[in-house]
Amino acid sequence: MTVPARGFLLLRGRLGRVPALGRSTAPPVRAPGGPRSAFRGFRSSGVRHEAVIISGTEMAKHIQKEIKQGVESWISLGNRRPHLSIILVGDNPASHTYVRNKIRAASAVGICSELILKPKDVSQEELLDITDQLNMDPRVSGILVQLPLPDHVDERMICNGIAPEKDVDGFHIINIGRLCLDQHSLIPATASAVWEIITRTGIQTFGKNVVVAGRSKNVGMPIAMLLHTDGEHERPGGDATVTIAHRYTPKEQLKTHTQLADVIIVAAGIPKLITSDMVKEGAAVIDVGINYVHDPVTGKTKLVGDVDFEAVKKKAGFITPVPGGVGPMTVAMLLKNTLLAAKKIIY
């Protein structure tokens, strides 16, 4: 079954805000017939059913509605409309698709956007000059450089060239550092998307075992930081016991960890890395993977994640699909960061 859109609103309405992921004394998912029978759609007793499929598309629609209301409220107070500047280098089809989606989503919530398109042979110096100009432009709330960049450009230098307070991707060294110190920051959008999926779905992490497969500085590491840190700190964390796996983790060792995990988050870029024998009954599986593979049935290329979805959904308690899971949520959290940057809440 797929979680309906209203389920997210009901969950928040019943439990209130859950900043510390699982600090509620009452579990968010009740067995049928309990005092909160409205939650029976999330679990069932008796015969084992397939996992609840978490619709990131539907959840993102609700978040975008919240952002749109926030933008309208901000403007009604006489403030400038939030403005997102996107720098796109080269002609990578996937990057162009991602940027179009971001521009379309920004428009839908009332955020102005502009696209600065540069050829793949653009110099690093020119890109830094552009970020400097945008940093000083008072009308620009947020700046995003679509990755990856060409090999001759130092991505870290470009990301650090964006002012931290306008770094809506959350990749600046100051934002990453503040995240690691449990301080408020602009959080990388994909990590924030995973966090939001967990909290809005009511997946428990307090004292639970979590495996994060993938240690990239923009995805895996920020996700692990959010989930293992103290729920009582300035920027509340998930209070989970987190294991990080990576390319040098032997498959059998990874399997040992995932079989014990209550939550598995996969961001490795390897199709079908997680199979059903690696997942314990009722675990939550969040698939961040983006892979394009050949479909032997249609003869075309299709998008898949890192999880063997059809097999794992028969065993997991919750699962996100690809497409339609973390992807739409990542765009929504980018827009949320843009509004936060415009309101100067963090910096």
UniProtKB/Swiss-Prot annotation:
<keyword id="KW-0999">Mitochondrion inner membrane</keyword>
<keyword id="KW-0368">Histidine biosynthesis</keyword>
<comment type="similarity">
    <text>Belongs to the tetrahydrofolate dehydrogenase/cyclohydrolase family.</text>
</comment>
<feature type="binding site">
    <location>
        <begin position="98"/>
        <end position="102"/>
    </location>
    <ligand>
        <name>substrate</name>
    </ligand>
</feature>
<feature type="binding site">
    <location>
        <begin position="323"/>
        <end position="327"/>
    </location>
    <ligand>
        <name>substrate</name>
    </ligand>
</feature>
<keyword id="KW-0472">Membrane</keyword>
<keyword id="KW-0520">NAD</keyword>
<comment type="function">
    <text>Bifunctional mitochondrial folate-interconverting enzyme that has both NAD/NADP-dependent methylenetetrahydrofolate dehydrogenase and methenyltetrahydrofolate cyclohydrolase activities.</text>
</comment>
<keyword id="KW-0460">Magnesium</keyword>
<dbReference type="GO" id="GO:0004477">
    <property type="term" value="F:methenyltetrahydrofolate cyclohydrolase activity"/>
</dbReference>
<keyword id="KW-0028">Amino-acid biosynthesis</keyword>
<keyword id="KW-0658">Purine biosynthesis</keyword>
<keyword id="KW-0560">Oxidoreductase</keyword>
<dbReference type="Pfam" id="PF00763">
    <property type="entry name" value="THF_DHG_CYH"/>
</dbReference>
<keyword id="KW-0496">Mitochondrion</keyword>
<dbReference type="InterPro" id="IPR020867">
    <property type="entry name" value="THF_DH/CycHdrlase_CS"/>
</dbReference>
<keyword id="KW-0378">Hydrolase</keyword>
<dbReference type="GO" id="GO:0006164">
    <property type="term" value="P:purine nucleotide biosynthetic process"/>
</dbReference>
<feature type="binding site">
    <location>
        <position position="247"/>
    </location>
    <ligand>
        <name>NAD(+)</name>
    </ligand>
</feature>
<dbReference type="InterPro" id="IPR036291">
    <property type="entry name" value="NAD(P)-bd_dom_sf"/>
</dbReference>
<keyword id="KW-0511">Multifunctional enzyme</keyword>
<dbReference type="InterPro" id="IPR046346">
    <property type="entry name" value="Aminoacid_DH-like_N_sf"/>
</dbReference>
<protein>
    <recommendedName>
        <fullName>Bifunctional methylenetetrahydrofolate dehydrogenase/cyclohydrolase 2, mitochondrial</fullName>
        <ecNumber>1.5.1.15</ecNumber>
        <ecNumber>1.5.1.5</ecNumber>
        <ecNumber>3.5.4.9</ecNumber>
    </recommendedName>
</protein>
<keyword id="KW-0554">One-carbon metabolism</keyword>
<keyword id="KW-0486">Methionine biosynthesis</keyword>
<dbReference type="GO" id="GO:0035999">
    <property type="term" value="P:tetrahydrofolate interconversion"/>
</dbReference>
<feature type="binding site">
    <location>
        <begin position="214"/>
        <end position="216"/>
    </location>
    <ligand>
        <name>NAD(+)</name>
    </ligand>
</feature>
<feature type="binding site">
    <location>
        <begin position="145"/>
        <end position="147"/>
    </location>
    <ligand>
        <name>substrate</name>
    </ligand>
</feature>
<dbReference type="GO" id="GO:0009086">
    <property type="term" value="P:methionine biosynthetic process"/>
</dbReference>
<dbReference type="Pfam" id="PF02882">
    <property type="entry name" value="THF_DHG_CYH_C"/>
</dbReference>
<comment type="pathway">
    <text>One-carbon metabolism; tetrahydrofolate interconversion.</text>
</comment>
<dbReference type="InterPro" id="IPR020630">
    <property type="entry name" value="THF_DH/CycHdrlase_cat_dom"/>
</dbReference>
<dbReference type="InterPro" id="IPR000672">
    <property type="entry name" value="THF_DH/CycHdrlase"/>
</dbReference>
<dbReference type="InterPro" id="IPR020631">
    <property type="entry name" value="THF_DH/CycHdrlase_NAD-bd_dom"/>
</dbReference>
<dbReference type="GO" id="GO:0004488">
    <property type="term" value="F:methylenetetrahydrofolate dehydrogenase (NADP+) activity"/>
</dbReference>
<dbReference type="GO" id="GO:0005743">
    <property type="term" value="C:mitochondrial inner membrane"/>
</dbReference>
<dbReference type="GO" id="GO:0004487">
    <property type="term" value="F:methylenetetrahydrofolate dehydrogenase (NAD+) activity"/>
</dbReference>
<dbReference type="GO" id="GO:0000105">
    <property type="term" value="P:L-histidine biosynthetic process"/>
</dbReference>
